[in-house]
From Swiss-Prot:
High-level lineage: Bacteria, Bacillati, Bacillota, Clostridia, Thermoanaerobacterales
PROSITE patterns named among the record's database cross-references: SHIKIMATE_KINASE
Residues bound to ATP: 11-16, 117
Cell location: Cytoplasm
Catalytic activity: shikimate + ATP = 3-phosphoshikimate + ADP + H(+)
Binding site for Mg(2+): 15
InterPro entries associated with the record: P-loop_NTPase (IPR027417), Shikimate/glucono_kinase (IPR031322), Shikimate_kinase/TSH1 (IPR000623), Shikimate_kinase_CS (IPR023000)
Name of this protein: Shikimate kinase
Family: Belongs to the shikimate kinase family.
Organism whose genome encodes this protein: Thermoanaerobacter pseudethanolicus (strain ATCC 33223 / 39E)
Cofactor: Mg(2+)
Pfam families associated with the record: SKI
Length: 171
């Protein structure tokens, strides 16, 4: 069966929902950011700090190629995976791409005090979120299905993902 690929902005619940969906569907689960951390033997934040975003995006592309070869998996991607169109092409070969969106204030609340968000290490994180969302919005349109998770529970989002997947894998 095709993979379920979860994309969308950081802190929209891709990993949390992905694990739940994988359990409910008896699929494997993989997170591309965790794959990158394993490849580099350091955290995403440390990669950004030491080597910069370009290096991280190269590692991300390698992780996507590896993840896209899997079958019967839920793949949670990093928030910027959509910035490289070839990543989406790879993931779509054997996957249904579902994008999570949320209002900026919800994203900021979800991030809370988490300091592991290198792109948000700025004076005004909410403004940075708005800017990044605006920049990435055209890329998010390439998803097969989009879910606004702003006012949904984890269980509701997981249920919506499964329903969308069942509908879309037929097409």
């Amino acid at each position: 069966m095709k993979n379920i690929v979860l994309t969308g902005f950081m802190a929209t619940g891709k990993t949390t929902v992905g694990k739940k969906v994988a359990t409910n569907m008896s699929f494997g689960f993989i997170d591309t950011d965790k794959m990158i951390e394993k490849m580099a033997n350091m955290t995403v934040s440390d990669i950004f700090e030491k080597y910069g975003e370009d290096y991280f995006r190269r590692l991300e592309k390698a992780a996507v190629i590896k993840a896209a070869r899997l079958k019967n998996f839920v793949i949670a991607t990093g928030g910027g995976v959509v910035l490289n169109p070839s990543n989406i092409v790879q993931l779509r070969k054997n996957g249904v791409v579902i994008c999570f969106v949320a209002r900026p204030e919800i994203i900021l609340r979800n991030i809370g005090k988490n300091k592991d968000r290198p792109l948000l290490m700025v004076d005004n994180p909410e403004e940075k979120i708005r800017q990044l969302l605006k920049e990435r919005e055209p890329f998010y349109r390439f998803a097969d299905y989009t879910i606004d998770v702003s006012d949904m529970t984890i269980d509701e989002v997981a249920e919506e993902v499964i329903k969308a997947y069942i509908r879309l894998k037929k097409g």
